[in-house]
From Swiss-Prot:
Residues 354-369, 644-665 have a biased composition (Basic and acidic residues). Residues 1-379, 566-603, 617-725 are annotated as: Disordered. This is Another transcription unit protein. GO terms for cellular component: Cdc73/Paf1 complex; nucleus. One of its GO terms (biological process) is transcription elongation by RNA polymerase II. Disulfide bonds: none annotated. The modification Phosphothreonine is found at T286, T593, T632. It comes from Drosophila melanogaster.
């Protein structure tokens, strides 16, 4: 029983070192144990290390105690310096002394003494070192020791740096103890056991470590009862250590859940409030640990929560029932973890191989779909009789020119109709075909020879000359045939059979025909047709109705036009109203009209107006002179008298004539208006109009003095006005 108690003591201390921060598994409701739990994993580790050494020394293994103390010292270095040293020193002194005194039968006392001493020694130090610094500034000491260093020192440092020491210490403890107690102690020393089991399980890819971190209820109950299951003792994180505490500790934590506890332990109070919250926070811790473990895979759901067999209400059950079979529970948990890791690794490898096979099959099926399937060749077997004809040795391809044509049906003199010579006849290729009636058409017929055989004959034949050239004789016409090779096999001879064609041969040569000489009828006909098409004569237009040449009678037509214009002017002046002189109205009008017409005929010269002006200024002229003057001025018949009067006027009055010329130019516009006034005045009016410097009216006045021509005087006035106009 004593050995069992010491085992329980060492197991509980080891479990508290690996996971929980409290020392007493059952009576840890004191605040000192809570503080020591909060203060960090380093101090817990130092305590648990000293306790494990204590239990080992009690069982008679001094080397294991040495290794435990050495390991506790090493874990002190990885955590916060002050708190760890103080706690480890106190716990070492108190735990080792008490355990030695008490011995193995008094293992409960060693529990109590360890817890009490740890309360006394560890809690003040943890209060000093952990809580103030964590409150102030991010707590390089306490926070690292509480959350970060608990993970590093508990899991990473215990795996990496402390691996050699743990192996050595574990081997020593096992070799010295040589019993189940030694194995339990070495397993309860959580860094050593962690590395051992992790190495064994890392090959099979197990996640039992994270499961212990996640903190199932079984881990709490088993660590509480002191069962050193490797799954639970393997974890060295703060969250795992917080979870490896019994039910009484939960109550104490809820009661004294301060801010320090939240900051350091990573929401341990929330974890104990509800199992689901605890699982979530433990999952977070396991995630942070898995980040540190490079190459480790994420934990599966089965590894985190375990199977239905692992989940049990061990918290409600009593501790002694579990204490009776520590070895059985240990082996069962180990086998379960190994089997889980194997099954998970097998299932993962299977799923990976399946996914790879699927990807490969998809990649292989993709190019197969892209390749189009070749269509099967369709063949139809048809029986067609073969046509074989003796085509001779040579076959030539002939493109008939426009001066040659072929009649395919046999010639019959009874049904033969002479061709109509139409020059616009077109062949099948749209060319104008030259019709030579019989001379350029190849015909054939069948006749019976003397032997009674039907023989074919034609009006055309080929003649081969000695130099190799050929010529075509068609009736009376001779055409030279030229042979040319055909490039390619594009021209074939086919025979029509039903709706299909049957090939007979391939044309290799081509024949072209040209007239033999320029004197042949075909050549002449060709040249004539070409001449008709090429000659373009400019057409001459013939006018059937032609009139007189308008340019021949141009002078006479001009004279006629001038006469017409003069007559029109006279008609205009006739229509003007005229005032008659009393007693001499009729002769004035009659004389005026006759003299007006005469005057218009002789207006080519300016002598008429000049002489009238000169006669106006004559003084004392006789009546005979006035008659001659009037007749000479307005008559074209008496040229001599007019000349005589002009000479006399020049001699008599040269100065007055020059003055009258200047005045007539300035006052020519009022001539016609004042002619009636001069007619009224009579003989005296002549002198009055003379004073007004109007030549036409004065000459009218002079004529009115003579008893013969008062009418002519009025006419002279109007005539001079029109002349000035």
């Amino acid at each position: 029983m004593g050995s069992q108690n010491s085992d329980d003591d060492s197991g509980s201390s080891g479990s508290s070192r690996s996971g929980s921060r409290s020392v007493t598994p059952q009576g840890g409701s004191a605040p000192g144990s809570q503080r020591s739990r909060r203060s960090g994993s380093g101090s817990d580790r130092s305590r648990s290390g000293s306790r494990s050494s204590r239990s080992r020394s009690g069982s008679g293994s001094p080397r294991s105690a040495r290794s435990g103390s050495a390991e506790s010292r090493h874990s002190q270095l990885s955590g916060s310096a002050r708190s760890k040293r103080s706690r480890s020193a106190h716990s070492r002194r108190s735990g080792s002394a008490r355990s030695r005194k008490s011995g193995t039968p008094e293992s409960p006392q060693s529990h109590r003494s360890g817890s009490l001493q740890s309360r006394k020694s560890g809690s003040p130090q943890s209060r000093r070192s952990g809580s103030p610094q964590s409150r102030k500034s991010g707590s390089t000491h306490s926070r690292r020791s509480g959350s970060a260093h608990s993970r590093r020192s508990g899991s990473a440092r215990s795996r990496k740096s402390g691996s050699a020491q743990s192996d050595r210490s574990e081997s020593r403890s096992r070799s010295h103890s040589g019993s189940l107690k030694g194995n339990e102690e070495s397993r309860s020393n959580s860094p050593n056991l962690q590395i051992d089991v992790e190495r064994a399980n890392s090959k099979s890819g197990s996640r039992s470590r994270s499961r212990s971190r996640s903190g199932s209820r079984t881990s709490r109950s088993r660590s509480k009862t002191g069962t050193p299951s490797p799954n639970r003792s393997r974890s060295g994180s703060a969250s795992g250590s917080g979870s490896d505490v019994g039910v009484p500790k939960k109550k104490a934590r809820k009661a004294s859940g301060s801010d320090q506890e939240k900051k350091k332990s990573g929401s341990d109070s929330d974890i104990e409030e509800s199992p689901t919250k605890a699982k979530k926070s433990r999952l977070i811790d396991t995630d942070s640990d898995s980040n540190q473990d490079v190459g480790k895979k994420a934990p599966a759901a089965a590894d985190i929560f375990g199977d239905a067999d692992d989940i049990s209400d061990d918290e409600d059950e009593a501790g002694p029932a579990a204490r009776k079979s520590p070895v059985r529970s240990k082996s069962r948990s180990q086998s379960k973890s190994h089997s889980h890791s194997r099954s998970m690794s097998h299932s993962r490898s299977r799923s990976r191989s399946r996914s790879r096979d699927k990807v490969e099959s998809q990649v292989e099926s993709a190019p197969k779909e892209d390749e189009p399937e070749p269509l099967p060749e369709t063949r139809i077997d048809v029986e067609i009789p073969r046509i074989s004809a003796d085509l001779g040795k040579e076959q030539h391809f002939i493109k008939l020119p426009n001066f040659l044509s072929v009649v395919t049906h046999p010639f019959d003199p009874e049904t033969y109709e002479d061709e109509i010579d139409e020059e616009e006849t077109m062949d099948e290729e749209g060319r104008q075909r030259i019709k030579l009636k019989v001379s350029n058409t190849i015909r054939w017929r069948e006749y019976m020879n003397n032997k009674g055989d039907m023989v074919r004959e034609s009006n055309a034949r080929f003649v081969r000359w000695s130099d190799g050239s050929m010529s075509l004789h068609l009736g009376n016409e001779i055409f030279d045939a030229y042979r040319q090779p055909l490039l390619g096999d594009h021209n074939h001879l086919f025979v029509r059979q039903g709706t299909g064609l049957q090939g007979q041969s391939v044309f290799r040569t081509k024949l072209t025909f040209r007239p033999h000489s320029t004197e042949s009828f075909t050549h002449k006909k060709m040249t004539m047709s070409l001449a008709d098409r090429s000659s373009k004569t400019s057409g001459i237009k013939i006018l059937t109705q032609v009139g007189k040449d308008p340019t021949t009678d141009r002078p006479t037509q001009l004279r006629e036009e001038e006469a017409k214009l003069r007559q029109a002017m006279r008609n205009q002046h006739k229509s003007l109203p005229k005032k008659k002189k009393p007693g001499a109205g009729e002769p004035l009008i009659g004389g005026g009209t006759s003299s007006y017409q005469h005057d218009e005929g002789s207006d080519d010269e300016n002598a008429i107006s000049l002489s009238a002006i000169k006669n106006r200024y004559k003084k004392g002229s006789g009546a005979g002179q006035a008659e001659v003057k009037a007749s000479t001025i307005y008559s074209s018949d008496e040229d001599e008298g007019s000349d005589f009067e002009a000479r006399r006027s020049k001699k008599v009055d040269k100065a007055k004539a020059s003055k009258a010329l200047r005045d007539s130019d300035s006052e020519s516009d009022a001539g016609s208006a004042k002619s009636g006034h001069s007619n009224k005045s009579g003989g005296e009016g002549g002198s009055a109009s003379g004073s007004e410097n109007e030549g036409s009216q004065k000459s009218g006045g002079g004529s009115s003095k003579s008893a013969s021509g008062s009418g002519s005087g009025s006419g002279s006035g109007s005539g001079s006005g029109s002349d000035n106009d």
